[in-house]
């Protein structure tokens, strides 16, 4: 489902076709998804 098509916490997020999973956000200067 849509929930699985996302980047888990700790994944690189810049230049990816997916967005960070729910309750995470892309920290651009660290280039990774972090929990919010």
Swiss-Prot record:
GO terms for molecular function: calcium channel inhibitor activity; toxin activity. PROSITE patterns: ASSASSIN_BUG_TOXIN. Keywords: Calcium channel impairing toxin, Disulfide bond, Ion channel impairing toxin, Knottin, Neurotoxin, Secreted, Toxin, Voltage-gated calcium channel impairing toxin. InterPro entries: Assassin_bug_toxin-like. GO terms for cellular component: extracellular region. Transmembrane segments: none annotated. It is found in: Secreted. Belongs to the venom Ptu1-like knottin family. The presence of a 'disulfide through disulfide knot' structurally defines this protein as a knottin. Binds reversibly and blocks N-type voltage-gated calcium channels (Cav). This is Toxin Iob1. It comes from Isyndus obscurus. The lineage of its organism: Eukaryota, Metazoa, Ecdysozoa, Arthropoda, Hexapoda.
């Amino acid at each position: 489902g849509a929930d699985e098509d996302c980047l888990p916490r700790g994944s690189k997020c810049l230049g990816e076709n997916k967005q960070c999973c729910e309750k995470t956000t892309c920290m651009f200067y660290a280039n990774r998804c972090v929990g919010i």
